[in-house]
Amino acid sequence: MYYFTSDVHLGAGDETFSRRTEQRFVKWLDKVAEDADAIFLVGDIFDFWFEYGRVIPKGFVRVLGKLAELTDRGVKIYFFIGNHDMWCRDYLEKECGVKTFFKPQHMTLAGKEVFIAHGDNMNVGNQPMLRLMNTCFRSRILRKLFSWCVHPDLALKFGQWWSGKSRKSHLKDHITPSSLEFLIDYARDYKRHNTTTDYVVFGHMHYPYDHAEEHLRVLFLSNWDAEVKYAAMDRDGRISLKTF
């Protein structure tokens, strides 16, 4: 089995809410690890993550420990950066054994061709300010300057404030199926250029949705604020959204 989830946003909310989310996520990891060929964490697992050369954010020890435990047991875990945890470096890979991807990936799973991406920074060609902001945030030079010039405490306070603003823009009450159309269009265009693609999996929108059309499925994963919808794909290549 292959499992996909996203937008856990560990660290969001007050301490009680954050701890409860972390505990639920650990239970989910334990559950799916029982028969997982691989687990895909499709971005924004952390509400904010900025990794210095020798410093990582305080907290998340249950999740970090669980990731290390599972990979030590041989479970394959793949981590895709999202717009909230794009400033990862090599900590998760070196310390937790989690393969980290900084770009979308096209993979063959159970005989199916699957394109996996968080979903941010896509179809933004007509949004110059968003394109510029994404370029700045992903700049290695600016990231290095930030780590040299800004104390970790200040960096995390700023990051948590910024992440809170960004997360509120994707409140589920504000999202409808029509809000997903720009990513569905992206998936269609990707399919035109990569004709063997069977499935496209996105996070980011905090709205679970299974869009099917001829020769293409596009699945959107939920966030973890309430009922969780994750994707599961069996060894015959059948994929669907499940509830946790």
Which positions does each model-derived feature cover?
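Conserved beta-sheet core of the metallophosphoesterase superfamily
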Residues: 97-102, 120, 124-132, 137, ...
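Short, well-ordered, mixed-charge alpha-helical segments that flank or form enzyme active sites
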Residues: 86-90, 116-117, 123-126
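Beta-strand-turn-beta hairpins that frame and shape the catalytic cleft
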Residues: 1-3, 107-115, 213-218
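Active-site glycine-centered loops adjacent to acidic/histidine catalytic or metal-binding residues
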Residues: 7, 44, 82, 118, ...
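Residue-level marker for buried hydrophobic side chains located in beta-strands
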Residues: 2-4, 39-41, 115, 201
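Core catalytic region of metal-dependent phosphoesterases/phosphodiesterases
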Residues: 5, 10-109
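Short coil/turn segments at beta-strand junctions that form active-site/ligand-binding loops
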Residues: 35-37, 75-76, 112-113, 195-198, ...
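Active-site-proximal loop/helix segment associated with metal-binding centers of metalloenzymes
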Residues: 119-183
